[in-house]
Amino acid sequence: LSFYTFSYAEGLSYFSDDPNSCMNCHVMRDQFESWNHSSHKAVATCNDCHTPHHNVVAKYTVKAINGFNHSLHFTLGTFPDPIRIKAMNERVALENCRTCHVDTVSQMHASPGGEQADCVACHGNEGHRTIE
């Protein structure tokens, strides 16, 4: 069953940086299309925002966890609608926002509690805007 699922879901494509691999699963079509029409398309692929940059082990660990979860939900038909980002993936994306936009982030002041601003609180749909 695992081999069939991996093969059917084109599992090897998830090891690439090709955004089209996100289209293997029909539930990601809206996210792909909104990225495809966003300003981020010119500067970032799915992996640039959704996988860690600091080391290759962390990158492929996140890809493996997400690949397993996606293939499981795809096979069982249990994806939530609309699909929601998990806490681990939101932390990865936020860190990548801060890495790519370091000049902007460095000019921001921490909150009185010492926490850095949460980019996705205001820009949560960035890269995945609703297409009208």
What would you call each of these model-derived segments?
Residues 1-132:
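Short sequence/structural segments immediately N-terminal
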